[in-house]
């Protein structure tokens, strides 16, 4: 049995899905600006707005989704763009997860992710609704940072997920369908 229903069976007709993923030009950026490209954030926001325009989608009907590093981008872009967000165990800057062996790409991000998310609550509209983050205090190495963001932005809904197949952060993405 799978903890999540398959999204294709659960969405309404005329629904368009853009999943935040950390690939291509943005590899390793978590959807954030890097030292090599300071336009990633603006490009993503413009891409979302462009698709909304092409498909005549109202802002209140947009949900930004992602897991892990894609969840980082989903939370960030959902908050700065004022979109609904559904993020699963996003990385918000806890380098302890890497045990002192930070991947090189984390050093290419223009501003450290932890700093970005500490400043973010002072830079956005706090009246946002439908900001949902799924994590687990039992298994997620990222949970303390997620809890800090929730403290700074109380409108974020933090869903504490408990499923026997999820024993560590890496298990979230493998047990997620969206």
Question: Where are the model-predicted features located?
Answer:
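The feature captures the conserved acid-bearing segment of alpha/beta-hydrolase catalytic domains
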Residues: 96-170, 175
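Glycine-rich nucleophile elbow surrounding the catalytic serine of serine-hydrolase chemistry
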Residues: 66-78
């Amino acid at each position: 049995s799978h903890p999540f229903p398959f999204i294709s069976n659960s969405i309404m007709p005329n629904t368009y899905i853009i999943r935040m993923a950390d690939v291509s030009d943005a590899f390793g950026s978590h959807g954030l600006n890097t030292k090599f490209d300071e336009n990633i954030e603006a490009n993503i926001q413009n891409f979302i707005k462009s698709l909304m325009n092409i498909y005549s989608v109202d802002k209140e009907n947009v949900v930004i989704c992602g897991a892990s590093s894609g969840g980082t981008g989903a939370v960030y872009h959902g908050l700065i763009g004022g979109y609904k967000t559904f993020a699963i165990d996003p990385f918000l800057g806890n380098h302890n997860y890497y045990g002192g062996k930070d991947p090189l790409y984390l050093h290419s991000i223009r501003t450290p992710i932890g700093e970005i998310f500490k400043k973010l609550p002072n830079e956005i509209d706090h009246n946002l609704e439908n900001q949902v983050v799924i994590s687990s205090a039992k298994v997620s190495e990222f949970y303390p940072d997620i809890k800090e963001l929730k403290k700074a932005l109380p409108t974020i809904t933090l869903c504490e997920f408990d499923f026997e197949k999820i024993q560590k952060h890496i298990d979230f993405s493998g047990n997620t369908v969206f």
